[in-house]
């Protein structure tokens, strides 16, 4: 939003300094600062509210006996609200919303955020210990992976920016002259990567309730 506003002001009135908004580095830095401000101000309020509502992680006794889940008990859950807010608001404010990659990243983030929210909601509000059934979580991850992979593969013109054309070709690490074309298998590869990375964070969060390190990476 701010990107389009700055672009309009720059083209209409041509004030000095507004040309800086066209640089991704500037907008990335501005988005990072915005996210930091949101998390600093909103985070403590949400955490305090969750603690007041006694919304916390429940540790499994059998895992605590094995030395696992020792740090999980009482950790406020639904902290993903802070992460999602700090990601989505700066992205919408500073990113180029005409770029399909940006749109799809926001869609994927919001989609998986809804899956996570449903899981926590069922655990905390509905008092269902297992939350959202595992197969439904996987189904949600595979579903958004198929949407993302298929849209990129079947509509490559939407994802081609300037001289950078979309390609299913990839290079093999440490062998720059060795290329591999995924072809139609690009779609299941997108599904695999999205599901794997999503579950990597989910499993880490399930161990101690502290997934922010993995999310940051």
Regions found by a protein language model. Give the residues of each.
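"…together with the soluble PPM/PP2C metallo-phosphatase catalytic core" -> "…together
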Residues: 2-217
């Amino acid at each position: 939003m701010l990107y389009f506003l700055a672009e309009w002001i720059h083209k209409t009135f041509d004030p000095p300094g507004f040309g800086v908004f066209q640089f991704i580095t500037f907008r990335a830095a501005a988005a990072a600062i915005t996210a930091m401000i949101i998390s600093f101000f909103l985070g403590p309020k949400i955490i305090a509210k969750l603690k007041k509502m006694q919304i916390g992680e429940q540790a499994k006794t059998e895992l605590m006996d094995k030395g696992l889940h020792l740090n999980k008990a009482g950790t406020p859950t639904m902290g993903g609200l802070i992460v999602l807010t700090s990601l989505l608001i700066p992205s919408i404010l500073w990113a180029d919303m005409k770029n399909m990659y940006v749109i799809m990243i926001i869609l994927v983030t919001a989609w998986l955020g809804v899956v996570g929210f449903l899981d926590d909601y069922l655990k905390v509000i509905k008092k269902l210990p297992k939350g959202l059934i595992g197969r439904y979580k996987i189904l949600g991850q595979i579903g958004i992976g198929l949407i993302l992979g298929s849209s990129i593969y079947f509509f490559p013109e939407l994802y081609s920016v300037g001289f950078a054309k979309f390609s299913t070709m990839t290079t093999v690490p440490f062998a720059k002259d060795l290329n591999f074309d995924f072809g139609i298998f690009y779609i299941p590869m997108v599904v695999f990567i999205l599901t794997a990375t999503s579950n990597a964070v989910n499993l880490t969060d399930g161990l101690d309730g502290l997934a922010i390190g993995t999310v940051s990476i």
